[in-house]
Amino acid sequence: MMPRLQQHKIILRQLGLQPYAPVSQAMHNFTEFRTDTTPDEIWLVEHQHVFTQGQAGKAEHVLMPGDIPVIQSDRGGQVTYHGPGQQVMYVMVDLKRAKIGVRQLVTAIENTVIETLAHFNIDSHARPDAPGVYVEQQKICSLGLRIRRGCSFHGLALNIAMDLEPFQRINPCGYAGMQMTQVSALQPGVTVADVQPVLVREFTRQLGYPTAKLQPWSLSDYLLSSHSSSSVL
């Protein structure tokens, strides 16, 4: 666990089911305009069907997207899939203020997922050669971050109770033949709503925050500047 950040609060936003592009732009705007005193935030969201290509993404890993759009992202990593039943958690953390490095944050996120899955009696692990969290050889959680001005954004995508078929249309995270799994395949009946509070509790514990404070989320709050628009999300 990291040194306690009791002097810093963290805000939780529940976004529900949202398209990828406007949420990504809102996250960029938040990061661009935050100050040294802006509280860190966690955003919980399920995205409508989308493939996102990370900065290292290669076109050959998108095999047959079909009717699912492919959007370029500036997060780390390669291509992945988002859809309903998958919990995406975006983590906007001021690393300078927290006095932690990127590797420490990645480890904290991976440990957050490992401990969350343990709560549901699922054994999982991280891999030194491939970011994310795995159950045996199957991937259950993808991870991709970007750091701007010492602050993180993007985050994790945990498969919970979703249609995994679209993963067969890509090489997930750039690995041909990578098999995906999800919480409900290992513990039938577990839902996104079951996992959310455990995931938030474990993340705040890993980084030593006090309890996250739930506040409403509105897209209009993040439409801050006309020059913050970008084609890379």
Swiss-Prot record:
Record-listed E.C. numbers: 2.3.1.181
Q: What role does this protein play?
A: Catalyzes the transfer of endogenously produced octanoic acid from octanoyl-acyl-carrier-protein onto the lipoyl domains of lipoate-dependent enzymes. Lipoyl-ACP can also act as a substrate although octanoyl-ACP is likely to be the physiological substrate.
Q: Which UniProt keywords apply?
A: Acyltransferase, Cytoplasm, Transferase
Q: Which Pfam families match?
A: LplA-B_cat (PF21948)
Q: Which residues bind substrate?
A: R75, G76, G77, Q78, V79, T80, Y81, H82, S142, L143, G144, G155, L156, A157
Location within or outside the cell: Cytoplasm
Q: Which gene encodes it?
A: lipB
Which reaction(s) does the protein catalyse, per the Swiss-Prot or TrEMBL entry? octanoyl-[ACP] + L-lysyl-[protein] = N(6)-octanoyl-L-lysyl-[protein] + holo-[ACP] + H(+)
GO CC, any one term: cytoplasm
Q: Which residue positions does UniProt flag as site: Lowers pKa of active site Cys?
A: K139
Q: Any keyword S-adenosyl-L-methionine?
A: no
**GO terms assigned for molecular function:** lipoyl(octanoyl) transferase activity
Species whose genome carries this gene: Yersinia pestis
Q: What is the lineage of its organism?
A: Bacteria, Pseudomonadati, Pseudomonadota, Gammaproteobacteria, Enterobacterales
Top-level taxonomic group: Bacteria
* InterPro entries assigned to the protein according to its UniProt record, in alphabetical order: aa-tRNA-synth_II/BPL/LPL, BPL_LPL_catalytic, Octanoyltransferase, Octanoyltransferase_CS
Remarks, miscellaneous? In the reaction, the free carboxyl group of octanoic acid is attached via an amide linkage to the epsilon-amino group of a specific lysine residue of lipoyl domains of lipoate-dependent enzymes.
What are the recorded Gene Ontology BP terms? protein modification process
| Annotated catalytic residues | C173 (acyl-thioester intermediate)
- Write the protein's name: Octanoyltransferase
Task: Name the pathway.
Answer: Protein modification; protein lipoylation via endogenous pathway; protein N(6)-(lipoyl)lysine from octanoyl-[acyl-carrier-protein]: step 1/2
